[in-house]
Amino acid sequence: MRIGIVTETYSPEINGVALTVAGLVHGLAQAGHAVQLIRPRQKSDGPAAAIEERIATTLVRGMRLPRYPGLQLGLPAGRRLRALWKSERPDALYVATEGPLGMSALRAARDVGIPASTGFHTRFDDFARHYGLGALTSLVFAYLRRFHGLGAATFVPTVELAEFLGGRGFHNVVRLPRAVDTNLFCPSKRDEALRAQWGVGADQLAVIYVGRIAPEKNLPLAVRTFRAIQRLIPQARYIWVGDGPARAALEAQNPDFIFAGVKSGEELARHYASSDLFVFPSLTETFGNVTLEALASGVPTVAFDYGAAREYLTSACGRRVARGDDDGFAAAACLLASDAVAFAAARTAARRCVAHLEPATVVANFVRALAELSGAGNAQSAPTDSVDPAAAPRREADESAAVSTAPARAECRGSLPVHP
């Protein structure tokens, strides 16, 4: 199948949307599909469009975002895209981001008769409220309804988000689960030498935060939660992976914290696997890929009950806390960190919570959905569970049941210490 993908952010930019789209693009190519990628030019790009095996990239103009220097909006490119698609027409188009480039791509696809679908990756209404722009929420949703209404379907990663958008006038919202690379994110990547660099011994607790270090990530609760853990386990250390506008102040106020900077690929996997507890208090995620990465790495996780946590984080592998319950969040993290039996069981079970989210399975479901929307019945996709927006996510059969201690997937298993 020939699939066009339009996105305003892409690897090596480091954010959830960029990494999700890049994983999808390469998964499609590996499955034998021809991918036409349209994205803004990045600093690392040469003067010509890139050509990879089964991936043809068209670069367009972009504009940097204030306060987010690592991100940019793609500028409208409708005329160029119409010309491109008249000569190199894809069977289906997927528009991953809702900026000017995405809007122009949807209109161009409509003009030349290419079936298009969209992805809902970012809760812009949450960002607007966080930055004191809540009065703009109705305008934001009006734009988003118009944008996604130009596509035949809108793909979302969770049942929760599908129901949320359906209640706000979005039509044909389809749940498509996210994937996690369980070969990359793996307990066997645990590195005692890295822990030694952090000043963490084999029997000490390393708490980790991974993500943008920015005000919208609820960082005061992260600090408060760790300090509560530290009162119970004085030798605990807090590792921060990422960067952002709040880092300098956070570092100055907490000189005992370890700031590792931005990590990706194998380095990121080593940091996850070398930690012991992932504490993620953000309330502004559309999904939260980091939750899947931590669980795949065998790291028990504490997060609020929405997004990826609601879909995949069970009491077997961590703790979900009601949104906005800051006291409950800190208490849950403390109880898990200080209960040796529960902690050991969660470490054993964490990877199993996401082991079924194989990239190849998610790609096959994506292709099947595009084929149905475009009428391309000859699309080649392996037999998989159908994409069903109303289907409940896979969960442990009974979250209150005793935790099984059966080993996680054997191909990626490492030694897992017990704390405290």
Language-model-detected regions and their locations in the chain:
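Short alpha-helical donor nucleotide-sugar binding micro-motif in glycosyltransferases
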Residues: 85, 262-263, 270-275, 366
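Donor nucleotide-sugar binding/catalytic pocket of nucleotide-sugar-dependent glycosyltransferases
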Residues: 39, 61, 141-191, 200, ...
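Aromatic "clamp/platform" in nucleotide-sugar-dependent glycosyltransferases that forms part
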Residues: 283
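N-terminal subdomain of nucleotide-sugar transferases
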Residues: 1-59, 393, 399, 409-412, ...
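Short hydrophobic beta-strand element within catalytic cores of glycosyltransferases
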Residues: 300-303
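Nucleotide-activated donor-binding/catalytic signature segment of Leloir-type glycosyltransferases, i.e.
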Residues: 247-267
